[in-house]
Amino acid sequence: MAAAAGPVGDGELWQSWLPNHVVFLRLREGLKNQSPAEADKPATSTSPSCPPLPPHLPTRNLVFGLGGELFLWDAEGSAFLVVRLRGPSGGSVEPPLSQYQRLLCINPPLFEIHQVLLSPTQHHVALIGTKGLMALELPQRWGKDSEFEGGKATVNCSTIPIAERFFTSSTSLTLKHAAWYPSEMLDPHIVLLTSDNVIRIYSLREPQTPTKVIVLSEAEEESLILNKGRAYTASLGETAVAFDFGPLVTVSKNMFEQKDREAVAYPLYILYENGETFLTYVSLLHSPGNIGKLLGPLPMHPAAEDNYGYDACAILCLPCVPNILVIATESGMLYHCVVLEGEEDDDQTLEKSWDPRADLIPSLYVFECVELELALKLASAEDDPFASDFSCPIKLHRDPKCPSRYHCSHEAGVHSVGLTWIHKLHKFLGSDEEDKDSLQELTAEQKCFVEHILCTKPLPCRQPAPIRGFWIVPDILGPTMICITSTYECLIRPLLSTVHPASPPLLCTREDAGVAESPLRILAEAPDSFEKHIKRILQRSAANPALLKSSEKDLAPPPEECLQLISRATQVFREQYILKQDLAKEEIQRRVKLLCDQKRKQLEDLNYCREERKSLREMAERLADKYEEAKEKQEDIMNRMKKVLHSFHTQLPVLSDSERDMKKELQLIPDQLRHLGNAIKQVTMKKDYQQRKMEKVLSPQKPTITLSAYQRKCIQSILKEEGEHIREMVKQINDIRNHVNF
């Protein structure tokens, strides 16, 4: 589920040389320079007779990463050792194994550091211990490779003591939990939970005076929203042990006693040692900030007699909607709880009747319970289960690459947990169905996947060796888990970007771009495919983690426990590998037999189809010939039909529009011919008349009258005028004639 299969390219280069870097040699040398009392603890407490184990050792996390660089806290030198995981200028060239930067504290902490925590703005690092807290300011970067102060070997860093006077004056108080306020837009604030059951919020601008204070003890006695059995918890002295922030949400108006507008705030989930969870809302957007009313304890469904354990130690809110809380107990139990919105039940309705300011309390639905194998359960533990009981505090770590996965670190090793049902839960909550039984079916069908990554306590007689650092590299170098053991050995394990079942990849899942997609591959992607069935069979519920060898070379473990350890590993290989592979083999053989029978049946069907295809081809040829003949006959019939229709249309008694127009034109032709004949006769008569006149004019006659020149001129002018008059009259007559004729 956590480990990635196959190479990841150039990103594997740094994974090969990092364990051999000189910084780990320096840290191991610093470990040898501890006080003799601390160095003699393992030797005096470990013997072949296996005496009782010492009290719990504090779990540390002294490692974090930023921008392709790994920061390791050097307790002896009160400094960070910075190792670049990338080569020069971001390339894949392996850097020198002796090259690193040292960030030295100007004002080193006087208390032991148990945890380092990077701020959301990535400009400060919190140095957390049980007796104090400091904020280290990271120096500026410049240069070609963007190193601190251009790549100096040693860089001085300023530190800001947080609540220094408070911890100095209150020597009996201890710091239980610390976390940065999750906003990246505001000035850095850090939230502290101390052993006096008080949560204080400090700003780096005023590190000695808390910005806000949440007194949990008084809230237990004076809160207006309490269940009936809460009065007994104060007398038992139950205190908060951890808290975590959820994603930013919008809260109601009366949460911060604001009447004009709603506000956005971060939900703060507070876990008590008895397993109860409280909720409040924190908003520092506007100075001096707002703290909502403390709600709780949040009801847990389904109810349990032991309230799901009395040794709760850690809480984690996964970044999803609805919020999913992970509650861890020292006995190794993990509870995955879905935060449901509050509903008005009888108890809350009664309380609201006398308290109008009371809000609905969200409830926790315990979706599933998971038990971690903190220490390896050997064969002898079955006879005496109380002899092998082991419990220790658990630290929960988010996975920045996969929101549905988180990791658990404790004194005996590291586990990875993947929640594969989150997307189905979102689909169920987003639907309009009111059937709650499907949710129960979902919890019964698919559980989370737990993988035991590292075991630092393989034998009962060995002391726990808690890891000193844990970090997930979310950089482009590839998602990778880095674990720093108690002896400063670096263990690296690649991670997948998504949650997958803890089963090996099948050959049929390999992608081949040259092979076309076949119907069998399409069937393999179905929800009920045989491939998924084989994956479910091969799914492992346990695994053999990486075992951390003991640093005590002179003391050999008892042979009985070594045999039990080998027997346990053999049993895991037998039950989780060989047996499951045998079951998968039987299923595959059964499947192959069925497929062979189907193949024979399909071959018979194929032969039958070939014969049918042959007969169909012959029939098609015959039908083609008949079709050609029928087509020719049809064409002849069509031609005959055209002739018949033509003759039929010609003999129809009803004339068409064109025929009626032609008839009218033909009826007008005789009248036009008659008018034209009359016009021709008139023209002929005029022609004859003019010819007679011309003959008379042309015939020789003796002039009887002699006219003078003046007379002739007058006569010519008169004739000319009369001729023009006659010409106009002829023209008018022709126009009238043309107008009358046509």
Curated annotation (Swiss-Prot):
One Pfam assignment: Nup88
Presence of keyword Phosphoprotein: yes
Organism of provenance: Rattus norvegicus
Post-translational modification Phosphoserine, affected residues: 35, 380, 438, 518, 541, 699
PANTHER family, alphabetized: NUCLEAR PORE COMPLEX PROTEIN NUP88 (PTHR13257:SF0), NUCLEOPORIN NUP84-RELATED (PTHR13257)
InterPro entries for the chain: Nucleoporin_Nup88, NUP88/NUP82
GO biological process: mRNA export from nucleus; protein import into nucleus; ribosomal large subunit export from nucleus; ribosomal small subunit export from nucleus
Highest taxon of the lineage: Eukaryota
Alphabetically ordered keywords of this record: Acetylation, Coiled coil, mRNA transport, Nuclear pore complex, Nucleus, Phosphoprotein, Protein transport, Translocation, Transport
Chief site of localization: nucleus
GO MF, one example: structural constituent of nuclear pore
Protein name stated in the entry: Nuclear pore complex protein Nup88
Any one GO cellular component localisation term in the record: nuclear envelope
Location within or outside the cell: Nucleus, Nuclear pore complex
Chain's gene name: Nup88
